[in-house]
Amino acid sequence: MTTVIHMMNGINSVAPTFKVNYFTNEHDVFKIGFSNDVVFEVNTRTYEVGTPEEFRLNAGQAAITVAFWDAFVQGGDDEKFFTTIESRLKSSVAYATWQLGIDFLPDIAWSKISPVELNLATLQ
C-alpha cells in the first residue's frame, strides 16, 4: 500500500518549482513529487537519489528529497521533523543553493491533513 501525504499549501520557496506535491514510500523506494512534475526517488536501502545527472541539475530538489526522507526515518514531532530537514539541507549539496537565497519555509495546512496521514511511522 502506498502512503501519500498531500501538502495542501506545499512548501514555499523563492523558486516555486520547489513546491512539494506528494510523498510515497513503497517497495524500498521513497518518492517525492514537485509541482514542476519533477519526481525524485530515494532507494531506502542504498540511499541513491535519482541519477547523477538529475542530482546535478536539480541539486536543491534532490537535497530536499533526501532531507525529507531523513526526517521521516528519524520521526518525532513536527518541530523536530522540520528542524531535521533544515539541518540536512544546510549540511548537504543544497548548502550552496541555500546560500544563494532559496528560502525553505514549511507552510503546511496541518488542519487539512488527517491524523492518519500525519503518522510518520507509516512511512518508515
Swiss-Prot record:
This is Uncharacterized protein ORF34. It comes from Ostreid herpesvirus 1 (isolate France) (OsHV-1).
